[in-house]
Amino acid sequence: MSNNNISTLSSVTISELLDAGIHYGHKASRWNPKMAPYIYGKRDDVHIINLDYTVSQIDVISKVIYKEIKEKNGRILFVDTRRHRDIVAQYAENCGQYYVTHRWLGGMLTNWVTVSKAINKLDQLEKKLADPEKIVGYTKREILSMQRMRDNLHRSFGGIRNMGGKPTLLIVMDINKDHIAVKEARREKIPIIAIVDTNSDPDLVDYPIPGNDDAIRSIRLYCKIFSDAVLLAIEHMLAASGVDLGAINGDNPSERLKAAKKITKMKLSKKVTKINVEQDQNKLEKDNKDL
């Protein structure tokens, strides 16, 4: 794709969606009538989703994600507390975003002060346990207790510890399972992108994607699409700063992203230094004229 061209941001095809099983809904008896516009028909008492709508929505949502990062410098939070958690966490990390995949704790969005305190506690425990001198005098039992607390906090808050504030966009894989996350985001007026299966209410989210929300292949494809949109936005942002993300060595997008950010910081630092030197030189010339 050419820089800053998002007209063809998502190139996913109906064939790819079919291969991932995204067209399979739930049993007809479990359907939500609000999903009727997105249902193609039934097969063996299972609803089949009309993938024309899915492709169209994926294109729209890819652009929403792209703009959220590039134009708003936003923070995107991926949510999936089911068995797919490792896939979701991996893709979120690879594109430099955030995730909750262990358990959604009530107040994660509506009580950010308490969440921040928990994250600070996690940071303190990690620093303490990493320094042998700081745990001198503690019994083995006390150290084990601190380790368990650290592990519990990491499971709950590790994916959002560096978020630096509430997310500006939520991506939810199953709005029925993670309904509390949806409820809190709506209360906080945080836009929601979500997969809506045939048993879901599409009216609960801002950007619904009709599709299977259970199959591992489906979740992997969704995450790849979302992650690609984020990475493209970051690539264009870095390109505007003179950094070519594609030219940085490494197979892992996350590592390349970190390297690119480091280069950007160095460039900005040099730019600030150059400005300061020029200012000092101008001041010196002015002082010489005054003499």
Swiss-Prot record:
Gene Ontology molecular-function annotations: structural constituent of ribosome
Protein name, UniProt field: Small ribosomal subunit protein uS2
Gene: rpsB
Entry coiled-coil feature ranges: none
One Pfam short name: Ribosomal_S2
Protein's GO biological process: translation
Keywords tagged on the record: Ribonucleoprotein, Ribosomal protein
Domain of life from the UniProt record: Bacteria
GO CC term, one of those recorded: small ribosomal subunit
Family named by the database record: Belongs to the universal ribosomal protein uS2 family.
